[in-house]
Amino acid sequence: MKNYNTYILIIIISLFSVNCNDDFVDIPPEYSIDSENYFNIPEDYAQAVIAAYDLLQTTYLNSMLGEIASDNTLCGGESATDVPGFQQIDDMIHTPVNDNLQDLWSWMFAGVQRAAYVIEFKDKIDFDGKDALIAEAYFLRAYYNFELVKWFGPIPIKAEGRFSVGDEQRLPRSPISDVYELIEDDLLAAIPNLPLTPGQEGRVTSGAAKSLLGKAYVYQDKFDEASSILEEVINSGAYTLVENYDEIFEHQGENGAEAVFEVQYSDAEGASFDCFQCSEGNIAVGFNGIRQYNGPVFDSGFSFNVPTQEAVDAFETGDLRKDVAILDIVRWAAQRGATYGRGYEHTGYFNRKYIARKGDSNVGDQNLTNPNNYRAIRYADVLLLAAEANARKTTPDENKARNYLNLVRQRAFGTTSKAITASGSTLQDAIFDERRVEFVGEGHRFFDLVRTGRAAQEIDGFTPNKNELFPVPFEEIQFSNGNWEQNNGY
């Protein structure tokens, strides 16, 4: 699974026409294959599912922009015109004409389409292990749709299979509630047929599906349902917090005890600026890197996604996570004799979780092919979501909420003396604050602010009733030929 493209499904659609008269019988070409007759042996399903995994690697963009859009980081880069789409999102002046939002839309729908292809033909043949493969496809479709609904709100959905040419002119953008209903249905279909532990690193488990379902419930304020499913994950015993927070984001910490689901990356195959989606590596790592860096431990990069002073100050005194999450380059350079360049909007800080380390082979462009996995769902996320759900459900269980919250804080401070004893709205605020410092640099902050109604007060330039969602790309609206309306305010 580390190198998805090794097994990428290549589907050749061949159209044959034969001119004949009554003296001849049409015989299908012996080796013709198209999308309708592809699934004939178990290996066909296996390769198609791996092809659906492949688009996960493009979610480097989602994780970067989820920070840049928030109050955690500034866009950075070389200048104010370096990647204009990023700069516009940072300043909350983005429009439907934005190459990066177009990429995000296209790549996530490509993932939906690949997963839906497997689902569409799930009943064509039977074989041992098929149910697990179909379950993976259901999870992946849910994962991509969850990203799409977070970013764009109403989107077209098709439960039974793939989209077809012209669907954009026939299918509506389904309401957000309908999108979440499909996400829930897909995950509930997947869970019974997924293993508790993966047979291969990077593959989906029942714990990953339950965790994503719990998160989808939280995003809809379905806290009773969320608390129930997330506690199944907690009580499974399959996961635990890694004792030392600084181990999580190093290469040796990949797929560890805290990993519920990770996007697998490799430096085995390179990419270029002409084809970001071709990379097997985590492009965000190079983009986040230190400009013109020369020194130990780290490698250089493009100085995007730079943490703000406010994000740094959000850490309490004694929080061991601070120096793991945030690299203070001024202090580091003074201590280690390193040198570096100053990029645009230089804050003096870098996202230490996801910047390049020395020793990576980085095939191709070294800043575009980094092997560091994206920790998409960590056990700490499960605990804090469960804490929030228990604090906010119909009949709150604040003891459970505090217990889950304080498990995360105990790891963060190395002591129980920092335990939270608050209740009511103060407890909820403590959980929100904890999410910020636990997941800074991981792409969750913008969406946490939006779903809890705090974005307008925390994000400079944020316009209520507009910036909760991003615009549907201009080309997609045009292709719909008037069938789709643009999101409010765009």
Where are the regions that the model predicts?
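Long, intrinsically disordered, low-complexity segments
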Residues: 20-24, 42, 53, 73, ...
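An aromatic- and glycine-enriched ligand-binding surface/loop that stacks and positions planar moieties
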Residues: 21-82, 188-191, 203-342, 459
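Conserved, well-structured interaction surfaces
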Residues: 42, 46-50, 54-60, 83-152, ...
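TPR-repeat structural position
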Residues: 45, 180, 223, 396-398
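Flexible, polar/acidic helix-loop-strand segments at domain edges
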Residues: 92-93, 310-378
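Structural register within alpha-helical repeat arrays
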Residues: 134, 141, 213, 220, ...
